[in-house]
Amino acid sequence: GPVRGLARLLRRNPTEAERVLWQALVNDRRFAGRGFKRQVPIGPHITDFVSFPLKCVIDLVPVKETADAARTRAERRVYLTQRGYNVCEVKASEVEKDAGKVLDQLHDLVGP
């Protein structure tokens, strides 16, 4: 469907923060094997990163976000939370500044 096609397009064209965070998630032993995937549709929404085994979604918040985008992100958070997902919002600017620090914070949320 259209959501799946959009997810594929987004996977092919990651933002700088997505690229940096994905590399960090793949290379950091604390997250390896935890089942994280990139740009995955869940219902009508596309998640930036999700781990189905952990029921954890990482949502990147862009530096400049329109009111519409913020509203959509809030709706996505409600939708996912209602379905038992833990949604971690991460500022893209923080990923670009210090991905290691962001991973430490995520690890605290995700657990061992």
Where are these regions (language model features)?
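Basic, amphipathic alpha-helical patches used to engage nucleic acids or provide basic targeting signals
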Residues: R38, I42-V110
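Solvent-exposed, charged helical/coil patches
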Residues: G1-R34, G111-P112
